[in-house]
Amino acid sequence: MIKVIKLGGKEYQMKASAYTQFAYKNETGRSFLDDLSKLTELKDLGSDDITKSLKALEPVFNIILDMSYIMINEAVPNTFNNREDFYKSIDCIFDDDNMDSITEIISLALSPIYRGNI
């Protein structure tokens, strides 16, 4: 599935497929499904909860950015040469506009695995 998602004030074409979880593991060394389960817990928090628990969310930042990086490069190969270049291009991860984007990123990442409502 391919979708355009706004992150850090910029629109990116992102793609999720059966390959996404393998690309994620190869790039990060972490389990795609384990990290997705952490993000689905985040999705249920309201924006006030997130603001109050930013310190607790710190590990989640990398998961969101890493998943975005993988799906952007899957949609349009070589959009970024490496994760560091991608990280530098993002001005803000969490703001009122990005909360919907984060939900979209999670839903897109899950789409090759499960197409129901989350």
Predicted regions located by residue number:
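Charged interaction scaffolds used for protein-protein
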Residues: 1-11, 31-54, 62, 76-118
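Short capping micro-motif at the N-terminus of alpha-helices
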Residues: 14-16
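Short, surface-exposed, low-complexity cationic segments
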Residues: 18-37
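Short, amphipathic alpha-helical segments that act as regulatory/interfacial helices
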Residues: 65-73
